């Protein structure tokens, strides 16, 4: 009642929205009903394959699953329900050369390791972690003796999809964030300017 005394004019907040809907992530295999033994077994198999490669000192494997249920209900008769399921996985191998102190890491399926998508456990099996584990480990070891990239002012390079997405994110996404534009960004890595 008190706030009504301060009203100068009616406020138009737009047309009444009466949306009704339900959405669920398309999932073929619910990751939450897959046995823990199956998930752990897959990670252990990938772990074993990576550890077979001489020169690999540390390996990592991970899976993550998210189920998020949301419901929006308004006083204007809107009712929207959604269930989002995410599934993700990844492996990484670290190789070291004790004589030079060089350390190299390769990961799969992304440069940062895990790839997470809105799908079910079928995504995990499609990644073929165990089948790619030895290759990932061998690439980590190969990087220890690989020649350094030449440093030219300009050169053509080929990036696959996930690395290109990361480059666009870092080169275009971060620079247009307002805190960076204004020079006020600060993080663990320091400040922009």
Regions found by a protein language model. Give the residues of each.
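Active-site bordering "gate/hinge" segments
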Residues: 1-193
